[in-house]
From Swiss-Prot:
CDD domains: Transaldolase_TalAB. One of its GO terms (molecular function) is transaldolase activity. It comes from Paraburkholderia phytofirmans (strain DSM 17436 / LMG 22146 / PsJN). It is found in: Cytoplasm. It is an enzyme of class 2 (transferase). This is Transaldolase.
Length: 317
């Protein structure tokens, strides 16, 4: 029997969401994504301590921020030895509201990859989907630096990213699901509110339909999954980035996978254009409590893990 993972690959580019690159090969993903939390998790494992120690030792005289950049590149370089496609490397979340600093950091990361012999076509620079992050992506894209817009929870964010010419967006499925489930409390009914009605799944489907209907080239990569079911409800999405534990579950399953999203069906979607000027963007994101709360929470969490990583590095110097 064909596995659910292999069936999914017929419709969607499968991406591995992990810093634990030793797990990559068995799932044969095209691309890989990392973030500060995933790198922090990986360097705390014994398997990656030599890479951490080697990186810190080689760059011990540099500021801690520069050492973190080198560590991100070290992980990205190892990942690219295993996968045929692209790796996503994230800009420090503490720069989420600073356009110029985000642009500078994106350029720095691409330059560091170049020093390791890796061309920019194999790297996606991850930026938070704030107004400032979107503006940074607009500049970087014009320089041929491809951007992956993360912490994306609303159609307003997605519309702004597409208008800015971002290469790819990562709308978060599981975190949207978490918010609605938590807020519903005892009224939540998984049978009724999950599956195709899952708020996170519906959000990505709407964004996908918007892009295809209006002819945007920006790739849609569903992210932040909680269950295999959420993933399979988005079969046909351009890309899906999936954690190793869920990749394993899909590999062990022989459930029949049907295509749920396609460009042709999306073109008939009943959906209006969203204004993407700054005032509209800020109002629309603010108007959606889930998007506002999850964006702020996500930035705080990634920033906190960056601080933990700094402390870990300082302790090794």
């Amino acid at each position: 029997m064909t596995t659910a993972l292999d069936q999914l690959k017929q419709y969607t580019t499968v991406v591995a969401d992990t810093g634990d690159f030793q797990q990559l090969a068995q799932y044969k993903p095209q691309d890989a994504t990392t973030n500060p939390s995933l790198i922090l998790k990986a360097v705390q494992k014994d398997d990656y301590k030599p890479l951490l120690e080697k990186t810190v030792k080689a760059h011990a005289s540099k500021p801690v921020g520069a050492i973190i950049d080198q560590l991100l590149i070290a992980f990205g370089t190892e990942i690219l030895k295993i996968i045929p496609g692209r790796v996503s490397t994230e800009v420090d979340a503490r720069l989420s509201f600073d356009t110029e600093a985000s642009i500078a950091k994106g350029r720095e990361l691409i330059a560091l990859y170049k020093e390791h012999g890796i061309g920019r076509e194999r790297v996606l620079i991850k930026l938070a989907s704030t107004w400032e992050g979107v503006r940074a992506a607009e500049v970087l894209q014009k320089e041929g630096i491809h951007c992956n817009m993360t912490l994306l929870f609303s159609l307003a964010q997605a519309a702004a990213c597409a208008e800015a010419g971002a290469q790819l967006i990562s709308p978060f499925v599981g975190r949207i699901y978490d918010w609605y489930k938590k807020n519903a409390g005892s009224a939540w009914d998984e049978a009724k509110d999950g599956g195709a009605n899952d708020p996170g799944v519906k959000s990505v489907r709407r964004i996908y339909a918007y892009y295809k209907k209006f002819g945007y080239k920006t790739e849609v990569m569903g992210a932040s999954f909680r269950t295999p079911g959420q993933i399979l409800e988005l079969a046909g999405c351009d890309l899906l980035t999936i954690s190793p534990d869920l990749l394993q579950k899909l590999q062990e399953s022989t459930e029949k996978v049907e295509r749920k999203l396609s460009p042709d069906s999306a073109k008939d979607a009943d959906i209006e254009r969203v204004p993407v000027d700054e005032a509209s963007f800020r109002f629309l994101v603010n108007d959606e409590a889930m998007a506002t709360e999850k964006l702020a929470e996500g930035i705080r969490a990634f920033a906190a893990d960056a601080v933990k990583l700094e402390k870990l590095i300082e302790a090794l110097r």
